[in-house]
């Protein structure tokens, strides 16, 4: 229910944390960064962004938002449900979710996080199939339907548990 970012490389991991903090500040909701072992245990140079000024210490007007006892959690859950359309819209417009068309429509590929790198390693000249790269959740429904409607079969590439595959 909360927005999640899943980087495919080190630069994306850096950028997603940077943008994730901004998104969290704008929405007042936490975000989740999904890091897989292979990416977490790797290193690479990244292009740094301009450092933002440190926020002043301020206390929340409603400290209950940080205390998730059952009564508070139920209220927060309802609020999260009401904001799903906002999160989906942000995901639809995210630069981290990218649809790339391909000439061969027999297969459509949904590549999540580092799965996208694995795919591109096998197609150094470019993939002949349509590919939907997922890096921000909730899933971008419009792009997903575009892929499903134009392809005969769908292959989902993801590291670890079948999170996207089961949705």
Briefly describe each language-model feature range.
Residues 1:
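Flexible glycine/proline-rich, aromatic-decorated loop/lid segments
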Residues 7-167:
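Flexible, low-complexity linker and terminal segments
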């Amino acid at each position: 229910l909360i927005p999640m970012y899943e980087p495919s490389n080190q630069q994306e991991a850096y950028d997603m944390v940077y943008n994730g903090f901004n998104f969290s500040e704008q929405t007042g909701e936490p975000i989740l960064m999904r890091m897989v072992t292979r990416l977490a245990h790797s290193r690479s140079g990244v292009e740094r962004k301009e450092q933002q000024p440190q926020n002043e210490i301020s206390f929340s007007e409603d400290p209950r938002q940080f205390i998730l006892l059952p009564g508070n959690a139920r209220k927060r859950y309802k609020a999260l449900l009401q904001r799903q359309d906002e999160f989906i819209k942000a995901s639809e417009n995210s630069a981290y979710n990218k649809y790339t068309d391909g000439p061969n429509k027999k297969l459509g590929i949904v590549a999540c996080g580092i799965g996208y790198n694995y795919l591109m390693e096998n197609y150094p000249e470019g993939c002949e199939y349509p590919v939907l790269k997922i890096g921000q959740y909730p899933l971008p429904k419009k792009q997903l339907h575009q892929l499903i409607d134009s392809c005969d079969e769908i292959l989902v590439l993801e590291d670890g548990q079948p999170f996207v595959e089961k949705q």
